[in-house]
Amino acid sequence: MAGEPSSNSWFRCRRIVEFRDTDAAGIAHFSAFFFWMESAEHEFLRELGIRVVDNAPEDEESLRRELASSEGVGRELEVSWPRVSVSADYKAAVRFGDTLDVFIAVAERGTSSITYRFRFENSGNLVAIGTVVVVRCLMRHGMKPLPVKIPAGISERIMAHQLPSE
């Protein structure tokens, strides 16, 4: 079934619920899941050889040509992946000391965006699911991030982890 972590699409990493991640009741605070999604995404990208913040993007020449007329494009190019949407649904509580398997896969890819799906499991039991949408952007000092196309080389590596169609 699409969405199950047995699919080869899923990348898995582990996170231990630290004391700082819990609330007064000793249960993981809802916000901890957002940090875990971001750190899992970063681990996933590192594994694929993709920088989270890239000062020398592989498509630098085409970016410079495409953006030649844009304001604020100087000698330094910095490309990153800001979040534009995040959500989580919680199924069961996790506590200090629990070990979570965090699974990440690609649900969709647009021209400049990626939608990730996350599954959190504790001892094989589903405890939460999440979604994060990121957009590849040119980051310009003092200016709004500018969405830019995901280059083919990056797209190929990421799409190897796309979930099967439902």
Can you say where each PLM-predicted feature lies in the sequence?
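Hot-dog-fold acyl-thioester-processing enzymes
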Residues: 2-84, 138-166
